[in-house]
């Protein structure tokens, strides 16, 4: 497996295979299947997404820092399920598949993640059992989560040290079948 610095990764744009990305200060993260197409219509790959996160990490990490993560993973890219395909759900509510081929994941097994990935065992009102959430701590963790196929990140609105005090709010307006004009009107 080739070992690259972040500068080399951004400049050389390896289009396939697996690499070890040297983040400096003794940290490295394995990035795999860079050639996997995540957005078929655009031809954009997993490697393109990882390069994007390397390039914006300095700007987004202060907002993600120390927040538990709910991941929406698309390990095979964004691909609508064929008509009639079954949407799978796990019984405990920690993972479920969507019609676009993605699934939400909250529970990570601490025994299966690299040592640099911090997890926090938390119980919420929605979840009757404790869940091991990944916690955004640094670029290595962010890239590890993206390498799992995470395209949509849903960080908690509070930080680990003060979970009962969110420091921002989001109004998530999902139109589903409603006309876009209705969403715009509601937002105003």
Regions found by a protein language model. Name each.
Residues 37-38, 175-179:
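A generic structural motif
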Residues 10-23, 27-167:
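Active-site loop/lid in soluble adenylation, ligation, and acyl-transfer enzymes
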Residues 52, 181-188:
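Long, well-ordered alpha-helical scaffolding segments within enzyme catalytic domains
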Residues 1-12:
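N-terminal nucleic-acid-engaging modules of covalent nucleotidyltransferase systems
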